[in-house]
Design a protein with these regions (language model features):
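Beta-strand-rich domain onsets/edges
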Residues: 1-22, 42
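Conserved, single-site charged/polar hotspot
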Residues: 2-4, 24-28, 33, 43, ...
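Short coil/turn motifs at beta-sheet boundaries
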Residues: 6, 20, 70-72, 97
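Exposed beta-strand and adjacent loop surfaces of beta-rich binding modules
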Residues: 10-12, 24-26, 74-76
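Flexible, glycine-rich phosphate/dinucleotide-binding loops
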Residues: 22, 36, 59
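Short loop/turn motifs at secondary-structure junctions and domain boundaries
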Residues: 33-36, 69
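A short, solvent-exposed beta-strand micro-motif common in secreted/extracellular proteins
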Residues: 60-83
């Protein structure tokens, strides 16, 4: 059921080619079945992004309680550029007061993608219960010896036994953002979002650590079926409130004492389906009551659980130094960030120039601020955990092209 769109949400579209290079493109936005009269047409700037576009959305209050009314408006987005085939995204979600980020890759092949409903409003099969800790025996099975955040997740877009389903290679943080944007609402309290994100990460890292599907003879990490794993929707938009939490906590997971593997933190909506794990709507109520993410997680998984951090993050050349870089900081970590930003600005020319001298001055702070603004992060001008790894991830991607 739809509702009158009498509030406003925001959309930013980012267009790149297959190598991640920004593209000058035209973005047309349509509502409903009207394919002739766009509600907005925007051009991307020098870094392949549109400005924030205001679009009507249902009242935010609809997303704050269970119901049958869809709490977001849906728009169809068509991106086109000279030398590339057009891409059409159907059903991009807009929530009141929230920035929606739609990333589109243009190639020589046209694409038409449909974004299915959020699991809280859509009709998806419930999770088949599993043991939260997988038995690991000396049977010759593949098992990692440390908890690792992989650079890439292989997502099987169907149930495990469906050999016709496509396997997609998705960067880990992008995968978590997609799942969280498909499983919960971005209007919820930050601590609720954090608790749900950490549960999603922990579940996913359990699949990685135990090589669950590979030990069953499959060649993927996880599926997009809610009966087996989480909901992942190819090409879907994400939301700034969720994206920022993932950037900050993407290496965190749920642990129990004396258990090495991340806990398989199963969850359900708590209204249409129930389970022994986290209730998504229940976590929303706890967040409204001021509970922290850890308190929310302990409410569902027990008082002995704690939030752990993965030992290894794959694909990152230099690990976070353990403290925030700011004006007055100096040394090798500052040099690392300066070198990485210097390479990034060759592609993202809106980032101002900076010296590579190992001293965190005003120019470095200005470059960091512009990077944060460009990638929809809180603009602080300082390099915290989230900014360090965001810069590093983009640096690695662009360095491969250099």
């Amino acid at each position: 059921m739809l509702y009158k769109n009498d509030e406003t949400g925001f959309l930013k579209v980012s267009i790149t080619n297959e190598e991640g290079i920004p593209i000058d493109a035209t973005v047309s936005i349509y509502e409903g079945t009207d394919e002739e009269n766009p509600v907005d047409v925007a051009e991307t700037n020098s870094i392949g992004q549109t400005e924030q576009i205001e679009l009507p959305a249902p009242p935010q209050s609809i997303s704050e309680a269970p119901g049958i009314i869809i709490p977001y408006s849906m728009y169809n987005i068509v991106a086109s550029a000279p030398g590339f085939a057009p891409v059409s995204i159907t059903g991009s979600n807009i929530f009141s007061g929230i920035l929606s980020i739609q990333n589109i890759i243009l190639t020589e092949n046209p694409g038409i993608y449909n974004i299915g409903p959020n699991t809280l409003i859509g009709n998806y099969p419930p999770k088949i219960p599993e043991a939260e800790i997988k038995p690991i025996e000396n049977t010759g099975e593949i098992v990692l010896d440390r908890v690792v955040v992989p650079e890439t997740i292989v997502v099987h877009d169907g149930v495990p036994s469906d050999s016709t389903a496509t396997d997609y290679y998705v960067p880990f943080a992008d995968y978590i953002k997609n799942v969280a944007s498909s499983e919960i609402y971005p209007t919820w309290p930050r601590e609720t979002i954090k608790a749900n994100v950490i549960a999603i990460i922990s579940f996913t890292l359990n699949r990685v650590y135990t090589e669950w599907y590979r030990n069953k003879g499959y060649y993927f990490t996880i599926t997009s079926s809610t009966a087996f794993d989480h909901k992942w929707i190819n090409k879907r938009n994400i939301f700034d409130t969720i994206s920022n939490v993932v950037d900050e906590y993407f290496s965190n997971y749920v642990s129990r004492p004396d258990v090495k593997q991340p806990i398989l933190t199963q969850y359900c909506d708590g209204k249409r389906t129930t389970c022994s794990g986290l209730s998504q709507w229940g976590s929303k109520s706890l967040g409204d009551d001021g509970k922290t993410a850890l308190q929310i997680l302990r409410n569902y998984y027990g008082s002995d659980i704690y939030i752990n951090t993965a030992e290894i993050i794959e694909g990152i050349p230099v690990s976070y130094p353990g403290y925030t870089l700011e004006i007055g900081s100096y040394g090798p970590p500052v040099t690392t960030i300066q070198e990485q930003l210097s390479l990034i600005r060759r592609t993202y020319s809106n980032i101002p120039p900076l010296a590579v001298d190992g001293i965190y001055g005003k120019d470095t702070a200005a470059s960091v601020s512009k990077f944060q603004e460009t990638f929809n992060m809180p603009v602080t001008g300082t390099v915290d955990y989230a900014t360090w790894y965001k810069i590093s991830q983009l640096y690695v991607a662009l360095a491969k092209l250099s």
